[in-house]
Regions:
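A short beta-strand motif characteristic of beta-propeller blades
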Residues: 75-82, 122-136, 170-176, 220-226, ...
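Acidic, serine/threonine- and glycine-rich low-complexity intrinsically disordered segments
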Residues: 162, 167-285, 291-292
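Short loop/turn segments immediately following the C-termini of beta-strands
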Residues: 52-57, 63, 102-104, 156-158, ...
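Bacterial Sec-dependent N-terminal signal peptides
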Residues: 5, 16-49
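Blade-loop segments of beta-propeller domains
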Residues: 78-114, 118-143
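Structural motif
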Residues: 58-69, 106-115, 160-163, 202-213, ...
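Conserved beta-propeller blade signature
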Residues: 48-51, 96-99, 151-154, 192-194, ...
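Repeated scaffold domains used in trafficking and secretory/extracellular systems
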Residues: 34-41, 84-94, 134-147, 179-188, ...
Length: 331
């Protein structure tokens, strides 16, 4: 399972990122300007934490459902919301939380979006909102979320993108991409949508994709940037620097890359290897990865100085670690 943590206060939010590596980061902020600043876990200057757990991923139904757990700042559990098969992403935009539930697969028809009041944790939708995916003829399989200008943008695993209105949650725009198995999504500083594609147009399984799609906010056109294989997450740091990571395959380590969106034809530059997940802070970008070739699944955490991309270990403190179990985790 993977988990995401939001520390919610008047102007505070901390995200412990989720990816296939179950990474845990401290003092990390979302790049989206709609999100408040972060707080360290050692500080109690926050009101609630929201923890997203994906549940049991891609096992024969019935699977263990994903959940959103709400804690107070004494880490007392206040509520648990079961959200269905595979909770995949959780963002705050304005006064609301949006949660993407992928569902079991592309034809399972059990994926959708939950909307919650960020202050109270109460549902704002009586049931999960589901959307038709014209590319598959089934209900959409949402993967990741971004937000801007009163809309939430959703990447679909089929290789499509949809925007929804934040007032009534109705579909606004939709575009089928020249790709499949779309994953991470963000809004660039140039007000364009960037989507990582884990599959190319005719791929029948994820992992071989080599493109990032670039779209206007209206989702009525698509261009592509060629990148190393299997891009996963993406974030904008500045007008001329964006970061993304790739998961590669069994023969290649994960890695972090950067590129300049103003010169999309210039090949991305490798920043560091071993980056299964990442998030951007005020001075550093933080990465986390698991070395699956070690018997104890060694956790690798690095920080990248945003001014010059110098990379160093995130911490030598043996008290900071990630523990994994089959059906539960400590973070």
């Amino acid at each position: 399972m993977k988990k995401k943590v939001f520390f919610l206060a008047a102007s505070a939010i901390m995200l412990a990122m989720g990816s296939c590596t179950n990474d845990v980061l401290d003092n990390v902020q979302q790049v989206d300007s709609s999100l408040p600043q972060t707080r360290a876990t050692a500080s109690n200057n926050w009101t609630y934490a929201y923890v997203l757990s994906e549940g049991t991923w891609h096992v024969a139904p019935p699977s263990s459902p994903g959940s959103i757990v709400r804690y107070d700042n004494n880490w007392t559990k206040k509520s648990t919301l079961e959200i269905g098969d595979t909770g995949n992403d959780l963002i705050q935009y304005g006064s609301k939380l949006y949660c993407a539930v992928s569902g079991h697969d592309l034809t399972a028809d059990n994926g959708g979006i939950w909307v919650l009041n960020a202050k109270t944790g109460q549902l704002l939708t009586p049931q999960m909102k589901q959307y038709d995916d014209e590319k598959t003829g089934h209900k959409a399989m949402p993967r990741h979320l971004a937000a801007a200008n009163g809309k939430v943008y959703i990447s679909f695993y089929s290789g499509a993108v949809m925007s929804i209105d934040t007032m009534n949650y109705a579909k606004v725009n939709y575009l089928e991409l020249d790709a499949t198995y779309s994953e991470g999504i963000c809004v660039g500083k140039d007000n364009k949508i960037y989507v990582c594609n884990s599959g190319n147009t005719d791929d029948t399984q994820a992992g071989e994709g080599t493109t990032i799609s670039v779209l206007p906010l209206t989702l009525d056109d698509e261009t592509q940037i060629t990148v190393p294989k299997n891009p996963k997450l993406i974030a904008a740091y500045s007008a001329n620097k964006m970061y993304f990571n790739v998961l590669g395959d069994g023969g290649m380590h994960s890695a972090l890359y950067k590129f300049n969106p103003t010169t999309p034809n210039v090949a991305p530059t490798l920043v560091t290897e071993k980056a299964g997940g990442f998030a951007i802070g005020s001075q550093y970008l933080y990465t986390a990865d698991i070395d699956w070739n070690t018997t104890d699944y060694k956790t690798i955490m690095q920080k990248v100085q945003l001014s010059n991309d110098d990379t160093s270990d995130f911490t030598d403190d043996p008290g900071i670690y990630v523990r994994f179990q089959r059906n539960s985790q400590s973070i």
